[in-house]
Structure formats: C-alpha cells, structure tokens
C-alpha cells in the first residue's frame, strides 16, 4: 500500500516544499536497513544515543529522496532533489502516520500485552491461525514506541488478521500504542515484575497496560493471574 509524499505530509501535518511527489511504501528509521531507496521515507529519529539527522546525506547519496526531519541538516543545499517534511517530533509523526494507516483496515486486530510471554503467544497464535488467515504480525519483539509503528505499517490490502505486541516501561506510554494498534481483540499474558522499576506499583502498571484494551470487543486473560 503506497502513499504519496504529499499525502504523508498532510497526514503528519508537516511543513515542506515537495520537489517530486513520490510513491512511498517503506518506513525507514535505520540507515543500515536500506533496500528500496526510491520507495523509502526516512524518519530521522532523535534518541539519547543517536540522531538520525546525521545519516540523511548518506541516504541521499544512496538514492533516498524523502525525509521526515525535526530540523534541516547542514548539508541540505547539497541535496537539491530531497523532499524535507519538517515536524516538531519525528517519532510522534511516524506514530501518527501508522495510526492513520491502521484506520484504513476493518479487520480483526489482536493486541497482545503483559509482563512476559508476548512474543511467544504471538508466535503461537500465528502458528494456529496461519492456515486460515493472511496474517501480519510484529517482527520479532517489535513492541516499543518505534517498533509498533513499523509493525502496523506492514498491513496491506491482502491482510485478513493482524497480531501486534505492545510493551511499555513507564507510565503514559500505552495510550500512544493503543492509538496505533487500535485492537479489536485484547490479550493480556500476565502482570509480573518485569519493567517494574518504571512504575510506582504493580497496580499502576496493570492499569497502564489495560489502556491498550479500552476499545476492544473481546478481552482474553488468565483468570488465575
């Protein structure tokens, strides 16, 4: 499923001057993962350890022409064919785009959360259901603020069922993941001590995880936990 540069700019409310309106299908956050430069849009994520803006010129030289940025790189004048979509927060913009993409599909979506076992349960469900449905699922343990948008972006016209993990490590994170995954079926594996250091109590963590399930038609949980 493709979006044009101008469509994405509108969805994420970016400020931009578009050189060429491209057809885009790949979200890129890691310059080392580049495979289809012409179809990629690079989100220059800024973290405590790294700044994606450092890799824009390298990616431009490899054929990428579409970039979501917080600020224009110093070498911008050396990239005359680049489409720079400027936003306040590149991660929030990617999450906004993924949430929009999710809303284009009216299919069962299973959101899986819990302190342990999310990936195992997701893979078990895939094994059980893959003969009956065309399934999209989170790659490996893509359950973070960055991983969930990349997972949801895989949904396409052939998808009949989606399985997505949602992991949190501190309060106020799950509401963003819920907006992106927007599950119709919620599954909680358990509530344990994992990532407890980010929460004042187990009850606080439990309530935060329940945020994922607020719009679900069906919730599955272990009655013994």
Language model region names:
Residues 1-96:
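N-terminal leader/targeting and accessory segments in enzymes
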Residues 92-224:
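Phosphate-binding loop of NTP-binding sites
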């Amino acid at each position: 499923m493709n979006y044009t540069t101008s469509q994405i700019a509108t969805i994420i409310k970016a400020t931009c001057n578009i050189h060429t309106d491209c057809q885009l299908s790949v979200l890129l956050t890691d310059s080392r993962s580049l495979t289809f430069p012409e179809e990629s849009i690079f989100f220059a994520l800024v973290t405590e350890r790294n700044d994606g803006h450092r890799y824009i010129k390298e990616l431009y030289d490899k054929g990428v022409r579409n970039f979501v940025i917080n600020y224009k790189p110093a070498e911008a004048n050396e990239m005359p064919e680049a489409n720079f979509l400027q936003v306040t927060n590149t991660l929030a913009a990617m999450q906004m785009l993924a949430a929009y993409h999710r809303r284009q599909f009216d299919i069962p979506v299973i959101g899986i959360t819990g302190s342990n076992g999310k990936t195992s349960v997701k893979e078990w469900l895939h094994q059980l259901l893959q003969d009956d449905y065309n399934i999209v699922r989170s790659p490996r343990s893509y359950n973070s603020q960055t991983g969930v948008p990349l997972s949801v972006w895989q949904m396409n016209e052939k998808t009949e069922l989606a399985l997505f993990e949602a992991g949190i490590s501190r309060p106020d994170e799950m509401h963003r993941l819920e907006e992106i995954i927007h599950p119709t079926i919620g599954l909680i594996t358990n509530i344990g001590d994992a990532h407890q250091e980010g929460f004042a109590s187990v009850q606080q963590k439990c309530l935060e995880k329940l945020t994922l399930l607020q719009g679900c038609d069906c919730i599955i949980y272990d009655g013994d936990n």
